[in-house]
Amino acid sequence: MKLVFVTGNDNKAREAAQILGTEIERVKIPLDEIQSTDLRVIVEHKARQAYAQLKTPVMVEDVSLAIKQLGGLPGPFVKWFQEGIGSQGIADMLSKPDRSVDYIVGYGFFDGARFEYVEAVTKGMIA
C-alpha cells in the first residue's frame, strides 16, 4: 500500500519517502488553514479534512518556528510572518544575543478512525 502524503511540495514528499523508506503518493488538495498556536491541533485538522476529501488514509504536516527571544513567535504562523516581513524582517526583530530557535515539524496520520501525531524538533540560530 502506498502512503498518501497531502502536500503541494515535491521536495517534502521526496524527503518523506527517503526517511520512511517507502513509496509516497503526493496529493495536492485545497485544505483550510486554521489559526491555532497548537501545532498538533492544526495538523489534526488538516489530516481529518484531507481524509474527508480523499477517503483514504493520509499523512499531512505543518511547521512551527519558535524563536526564543520572541517568546516562541511566530510559532505555527511562520508562513504569514514570512509573507509579511520576510526572513530579513524576522532577523531584524532580534536585538539580543540569544538568537536561538526551534524549528518544529508536526506530522499527522489519519486512517478514518485513528489519528497519530509526531513532532521533530531541530534546534538552530537565526543569523
Segments (PLM) and residue ranges:
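Anionic-ligand binding patches
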Residues: 2-4, 11-127
